[in-house]
Amino acid sequence: MRALITGVSGQDGTILASMLAAQGFSVVGLVKPGTEYSRLLRYVPGVEIAEVDLADHSGIRSVISSVAPTHMWNFGGFTAPGDSWDHSDEVFAVNVDSVRVMLESLQRVSDSPRFFQASSASIFEGVDRAPQTESMQPEPKSPYAVSKLEAMQLVDGARRDLGLFGVSGIFYNHESPLRGVGFVTRKVSHAAARIAAGLEDRLELGDIEVARDWGWAPDYVRASILMINAEVPKDYVLATGISHRLSYFVEKAFAAVGIVNWQDYVFSTSENTRTVDTNLMVGASRAAYLDLGWRHTIDFDSMAAIMVAHDVAQLADPKATWEI
């Protein structure tokens, strides 16, 4: 079996590559030219890397033709919703146009390939009801969210009209030690470790009472494997169904390094506060539980502790890895 993964050097791509390699897959990963991927190679030494920009349609076609994947996951693309208004051309080029090219190219592969599209809860950002389900009408507001919905529609069309086994997983927030430091949960775990070590003395955040449906990233990647291998291709909401405030994550992260009085180190600043936030984003994954047998393996408190423990380990050894 041959897997092709876009965005392979990111959190989800690295976790997926590790899981698939353990299952005996031959794994090829796409990264944007110039991307640093040494971390990926520490986790999955045998992965083959192809440097292709998702805006390079001929490059995408060439890789798919040469690899002839039996399974393909699209985890790549523009991933910063807040910046999407300033980069809308890029957003639609890499989040929508590239998906069309992938689907067209896969049609020419003879092994009846299967395709997974990583979608986003942001397609529901304008919905004022919670929890959100697969049957709800999406209400995207940002260019990023619109691009994610359009990509889903392309996959649905390829499934319906072309007979391609294509599915979209509607991912809610999911975290792990491999999350980038630019994401708020990793920013918190990283700072907690450094403050406990005496390397920093404050952490500046935006609104710490913002609430999100945060889950454990490896569980979501496992869901994508279940979806792409299912008998019937269907789209699913992938979420915990539980909302937590950021302040609670901060509390648990600092507690993991023995700091109870976290309020002495954490400060909310207007510079870090979003001018417009989304409605309450909580997903209902009952369909995935029933159809796929999907389950969560790590709770919220444990997730915070694991992330902090890895950041502590990396203070001693920057190349320390975490067992996926």
Segments predicted by a language model, with ranges:
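The catalytic Tyr-centered alpha-helix of NAD(P)H-dependent dehydrogenases
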Residues: 136, 140-147, 177, 181-185, ...
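Generic recognition of short, well-ordered alpha-helical segments
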Residues: 15, 42, 62, 86, ...
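N-terminal Rossmann-like NAD(P)+-binding domain of SDR-like oxidoreductases, especially those catalyzing
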Residues: 1-174, 298, 322-324
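Residues that recognize and position ribonucleotide moieties
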Residues: 116, 130, 167, 181, ...
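Residue-level signature of the cytosolic catalytic core of signaling kinases
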Residues: 43, 52, 56, 180-181, ...
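Charged catalytic carboxylate motif
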Residues: 59, 98-101, 150, 187, ...
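Hydrophobic alpha-helix immediately C-terminal to the catalytic Tyr-X-X-X-Lys motif of short-chain
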Residues: 146, 150-158, 187-191, 249, ...
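C-terminal substrate-binding subdomain of Rossmann-fold SDR/epimerase-dehydratase oxidoreductases
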Residues: 29, 185-186, 192-324
